């Protein structure tokens, strides 16, 4: 039906007869001469038709988004009529034949216009997908999936599918449940991850497994979250952290070659505690400096009770400083006020600072500091004339969080971030357990191997866990797993999953661990998030063919939707009014 895609045609084809197919992107009638911009997956090419052409009458019928097949001769555009914005901007096709394969209603959205209301774009997603930019996103997505399969297959991994209808298990989010028609009152759960099945594959001697897995989590959505998503999932037997990290680094190196990036290995590694203390995040963006600096001891003799009391409890509280070089000339009073309002959103009670002037130091903290304390702060933060040093004080978790966010906010405000840089990082030595209102729970998941389970302070127990971070975004992570029944039971006890509950929820896993489970570990990389970063897309919804909204609904199909009484009866379900 066609000889070329639109953007395959160039000056070398001048004089040739070509056949192209696609949609009418724009239609113009200039004094009897008709111009049509034809669009296909590759981009645009201009068709031109004057009254002398036998295709002219048909060309007059064309409107936006009509489906066309066009045949004609390639020629150079006239002098001064070239379009440098188009790949085909130097040529045009003089129409000889034109077929209207299908007409179109007036489109409710402009194809390729990202400023159109997103709900409208999602409702008419099949139109939104027609833009060449969308095609390039899904072309890359397909290429990355193929690279993943080829790379892991070369390393001896087998692609194995795990069940979608599974058992509900606690993994940090709510499960999507599927009622069983056959087993009245019982439910399947859609998998939040293939975690337990891939561990069972290792028990089964599969040695190295992977799949590009569909996962489901019923959780509150954010810009980078979806209720159903895809991850590159893998597991290895007889391995340690270094082995797993090596596979991930090799895989990411091959993947990023697809977009012309050469990334070096090994990636930098940073302990979790260092990441939190120095950057206020377990996924720090290292494309710029601005470290957080501990200055608690400088406030021990401060006359400000809030700061001095905080300084006396270094286990649970923190005083962090952030020196922003040259900020005094760049940050007006209104900007400082905006930054204070920003950190208040995350639990700060205010934002103290010191402005380093030529002949004095200004700021609300100056009068509360001793001469020695002030001197130590200036030395430790390397504060020079023109700098502003910001301070956060209070509960450790809250301070690290809002000061880490302030660090990012300042970097964005001052344009300190190299948008083209790729800064990969491993964050390691995560805490095994986290405190909640109801005791402790597993920070990653309860199948992670702890490093020092006998430690008296449960909050100091570390996990054989690791996250891979790119430019401040968690790409994925993994861990070495527990492969002995006794250790698995011990971890369950630490998080108040006692024997009876453990058997009910995880009896099949505990049983499997009795039969010679090998040491094993693995990883998962968020596939959608990876493609979002590689394409510099604004939202994860841009890289999923038919995404859900932030309210977990599909505007295209109106899912979820009610079901009729007969279906409910078959499933033994009665709805409460």
From Swiss-Prot:
Family annotation (InterPro entries): Aa-tRNA-synt_II, aa-tRNA-synth_II, aa-tRNA-synth_II/BPL/LPL, Asp-tRNA-ligase_1, Asp-tRNA-ligase_1_N, Asp/Asn-tRNA-synth_IIb, AspRS_core, GAD-like_sf
Sites marked Important for tRNA non-discrimination: 30, 80
Location of the region described as Aspartate in the Swiss-Prot/TrEMBL record: 195-198
Keyword Nucleotide-binding carried by entry: yes
UniProt enzyme class: ligase
Binding site for ATP: 217-219, 226, 474, 526-529
Binding site for L-aspartate: 171, 217, 444, 481
Stated consequence of mutating residue 81 to N: Enhances enzyme specificity for tRNA(Asp) over tRNA(Asn), by reducing enzyme's ability to misacylate tRNA(Asn)
Entry keyword annotation includes Ligase: yes
Keywords: Aminoacyl-tRNA synthetase, ATP-binding, Cytoplasm, Ligase, Nucleotide-binding, Protein biosynthesis
Catalytic reactions on record: tRNA(Asx) + L-aspartate + ATP = L-aspartyl-tRNA(Asx) + AMP + diphosphate
Recorded GO CC terms: cytoplasm
SUPFAM superfamilies, sorted: Class II aaRS and biotin synthetases, GAD domain-like, Nucleic acid-binding proteins
Enzyme Commission (EC) number: 6.1.1.23
Gene Ontology molecular function, alphabetical: aspartate-tRNA ligase activity; aspartate-tRNA(Asn) ligase activity; ATP binding; nucleic acid binding
Database matches in PROSITE patterns: AA_TRNA_LIGASE_II
Location(s) in or outside the cell: Cytoplasm
BP GO annotations: aspartyl-tRNA aminoacylation
Task performed by this protein: Aspartyl-tRNA synthetase with relaxed tRNA specificity since it is able to aspartylate not only its cognate tRNA(Asp) but also tRNA(Asn). Is 1.7 times more efficient at aminoacylating tRNA(Asp) over tRNA(Asn). Reaction proceeds in two steps: L-aspartate is first activated by ATP to form Asp-AMP and then transferred to the acceptor end of tRNA(Asp/Asn).
NCBIfam families cross-referenced by the UniProt entry: aspS_bact, PRK00476.1
Family recorded in the similarity comment: Belongs to the class-II aminoacyl-tRNA synthetase family. Type 1 subfamily.
Subunit structure of this chain's protein: Homodimer.
The protein's name: Aspartate--tRNA(Asp/Asn) ligase
Species for this entry: Helicobacter pylori (strain ATCC 700392 / 26695) (Campylobacter pylori)
């Amino acid at each position: 039906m066609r000889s070329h895609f639109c953007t395959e045609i160039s000056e070398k084809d001048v004089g040739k007869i070509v056949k192209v197919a696609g949609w009418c992107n724009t239609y113009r009638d200039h004094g009897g001469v008709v111009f049509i911009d034809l669009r296909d997956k590759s981009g645009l090419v201009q068709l031109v038709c004057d009254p002398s052409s036998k295709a002219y009458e048909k060309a007059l019928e064309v409107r936006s988004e009509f489906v066309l097949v066009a045949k004609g001769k390639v020629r150079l555009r006239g002098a001064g009529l070239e379009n440098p914005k188009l790949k085909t901007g130097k040529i045009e096709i003089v129409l000889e034949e034109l077929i209207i394969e299908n007409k179109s209603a007036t489109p409710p959205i402009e194809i390729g216009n990202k400023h159109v209301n997103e709900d409208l774009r999602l409702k008419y997603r099949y139109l939104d997908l027609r833009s060449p930019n969308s095609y390039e996103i899904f072309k890359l997505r397909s290429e990355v999936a193929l690279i993943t399969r080829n790379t892991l297959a070369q390393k001896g991994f087998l692609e194995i599918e795990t069940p979608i209808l599974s058992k509900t298990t606690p993994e940090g989010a709510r499960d999507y449940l599927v009622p069983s028609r056959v087993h009245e009152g019982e439910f399947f759960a859609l998998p939040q991850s293939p975690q337990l099945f891939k561990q069972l594959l290792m028990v089964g001697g599969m040695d190295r497994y992977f799949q590009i897995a569909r996962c489901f989590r019923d959780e509150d959505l954010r810009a980078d979250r979806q209720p159903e998503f895809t991850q590159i999932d893998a597991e290895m037997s007889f391995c340690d952290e270094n082995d797993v990290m090596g596979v991930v680094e090799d895989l990411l190196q091959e993947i990023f070659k697809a977009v012309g990036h050469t990334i070096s290995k090994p990636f930098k590694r940073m302990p979790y505690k260092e990441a939190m203390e120095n950057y206020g995040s377990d996924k720090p963006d290292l494309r710029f400096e601005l470290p957080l600096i501990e200055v608690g001891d400088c406030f021990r003799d401060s006359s400000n009770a809030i700061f001095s009391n905080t300084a006396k409890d270094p286990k649970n509280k923190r005083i962090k400083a952030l020196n922003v070089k040259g900020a005094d000339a760049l940050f007006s009073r209104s900007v400082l006020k905006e930054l204070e309002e920003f950190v208040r959103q995350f639990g700060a009670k205010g934002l103290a600072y010191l402005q380093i002037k030529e002949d004095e130091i200004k700021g609300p903290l100056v009068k509360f500091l001793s001469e020695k304390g002030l001197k130590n702060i200036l030395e430790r933060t390397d504060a020079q004339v023109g700098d502003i040093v910001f301070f956060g004080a209070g509960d450790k978790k809250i301070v690290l969080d809002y000061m880490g966010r302030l660090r990012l906010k300042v970097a964005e405000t001052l344009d300190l971030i190299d948008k083209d840089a790729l800064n990969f990082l491993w964050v390691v030595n995560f805490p095994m357990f986290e405190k909640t209102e109801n005791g402790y729970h597993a920070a990653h998941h309860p199948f992670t191997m702890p490093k020092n389970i006998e430690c008296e302070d449960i909050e100091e127990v570390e996990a054989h866990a690791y996250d891979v971070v790119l430019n401040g975004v968690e790409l994925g992570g993994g861990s070495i797993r527990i492969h002995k029944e006794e250790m698995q039971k011990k971890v369950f006890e630490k998080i108040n999953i006692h024997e009876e509950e453990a058997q009910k929820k995880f009896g099949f896993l505990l049983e499997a661990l009795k039969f010679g489970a090998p040491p094993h570990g693995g990883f998962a990389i968020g596939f959608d998030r990876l493609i979002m970063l590689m394409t510099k897309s604004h939202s994860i919804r841009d890289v999923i063919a038919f995404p859900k909204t932030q309210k977990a609904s599909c505007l295209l199909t109106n899912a979820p939707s009610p079901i009729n009484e007969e279906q409910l009866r078959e499933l033994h379900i009665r709805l409460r009014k």
